[in-house]
Amino acid sequence: MLPRLVCISDYEQHVRSVLQKSVYDYYRSGANDQETLADNIQAFSRWKLYPRMLRNVADIDLSTSVLGQRVSMPICVGATAMQCMAHVDGELATVRACQTMGTGMMLSSWATSSIEEVAEAGPEALRWMQLYIYKDREISRQIVKRAEKQGYKAIFVTVDTPYLGNRIDDVRNRFKLPPQLRMKNFETNDLAFSPKGNFGDNSGLAEYVAQAIDPSLSWDDITWLRRLTSLPIVVKGILRGDDAKEAVKHGVDGILVSNHGARQLDGVPATIDVLPEIVEAVEGKVEVFLDGGVRKGTDVLKALALGAKAVFVGRPIIWGLAFQGEKGVQDVLEILKEEFRLAMALSGCQNVKVIDKTLVRKNPLAVSKI
């Protein structure tokens, strides 16, 4: 009999004993001492909720829009690579769950299911494409054009990975893809991170990034991407107000406040702590989103109160996927949705439009660990 899992931490605790160690470590771990990994979650507790009373909350509307597309709730699925390591159906199970739940999924360029396969599995799902800028720009261009053709609604370009962060668990485990898997958006063994490729004796993914991803990425590449596609462009990985302003100048449609799940530069702030700076910097000109550390419905409420249009979740989706495939992903999303609904009701919020910064204040006694 399967255990009864009722919150996100239950899922992570359970799948730790289910997944192969190197796979679990890959999904779970952060960079270096993992200070930011812990802080991403702990930071939410530094922001306290100040609920409104005597509001009619008999009916709660969670729906909102992301880049002009309607979603049932401001909880979306972030780009998590190589999901077939967690479950045989991988990204196909995830997109089907998103389709059922009426929310959006960002597909990783490094998926173990192709752009086309995911579109076929979730034809009615709201899908976005995550993009890395490769040394060979033609590779990135083809990913964008394939995503356009298959009905993906936006491009989320990752800008925080000129090199891969020092993920010590991956180095210890000499992380590589299992022999039966490959990144299915690429043809050659080297680009597909195939076990047949040569990726050294340490973290194979770090070697892959060093070989393939362009460390000379600059704002000129955002201009190039803007000329390449008419799809909305979201810059993923911004943590400073001046970078946010520069992104707006370069014509992006959104900013995803992200520290890559604490997997790149350890010691950066938790995303919830820098969110207000980014929201202030863009002056309402583009939509702002957040990922990193979202584990509860109250986390979602706090992020929206501080100005995020929606949040993206990554690891919780993997834990649900590893537990029970499509159903596990759907159950995780249902848990977050119902927790968020309750948090809204107990805060006096009938819909997401009335969620504002008066609902949260930073605890003056709380001191960040970063």
UniProtKB/Swiss-Prot annotation:
Protein name: 2-Hydroxyacid oxidase 1
Keyword Cell inner membrane: no
Obligatory cofactor(s): FMN
Residues reported in the UniProt entry to bind glyoxylate: Y26, Y132, R167, H260, R263
A GO term for molecular function: FMN binding
SUPFAM superfamilies cross-referenced by the UniProt entry: FMN-linked oxidoreductases
Binding site for FMN: 79-81, 108, 130, 158, 236, 258, 291-295, 314-315
GO CC terms, sorted: peroxisomal matrix; peroxisome
InterPro entries: Aldolase_TIM (IPR013785), Alpha-hydoxy_acid_DH_FMN (IPR012133), FMN-dep_DH (IPR000262), FMN_HAD (IPR037396), FMN_hydac_DH_AS (IPR008259)
Modified residues (Phosphoserine): S194, S230
Any coiled-coil regions, as ranges: none
Location of this chain's protein in the cell: Peroxisome matrix
CDD domains in the record: alpha_hydroxyacid_oxid_FMN
Enzyme class: oxidoreductase
Job of this protein: Broad substrate specificity (S)-2-hydroxy-acid oxidase that preferentially oxidizes glycolate. The glyoxylate produced by the oxidation of glycolate can then be utilized by alanine-glyoxylate aminotransferase for the peroxisomal synthesis of glycine; this pathway appears to be an important step for the detoxification of glyoxylate which, if allowed to accumulate, may be metabolized to oxalate with formation of kidney stones. Can also catalyze the oxidation glyoxylate, and long chain hydroxyacids such as 2-hydroxyhexadecanoate and 2-hydroxyoctanoate.
Boundaries of every FMN hydroxy acid dehydrogenase domain copy: 1-365
UniProt cross-references to Gene3D superfamilies, sorted A to Z: Aldolase class I (3.20.20.70)
EC nos: 1.1.3.15, 1.2.3.5
Family membership: Belongs to the FMN-dependent alpha-hydroxy acid dehydrogenase family.
N6-succinyllysine PTM positions: K184
Pathway noted in the entry: Amino-acid biosynthesis; glycine biosynthesis
Quaternary context: Homotetramer.
Single GO BP term: glycolate catabolic process
Motif extent (Microbody targeting signal): 368-370
Organism: Mus musculus (Mouse)
Keyword rRNA processing included in the entry's annotation: no
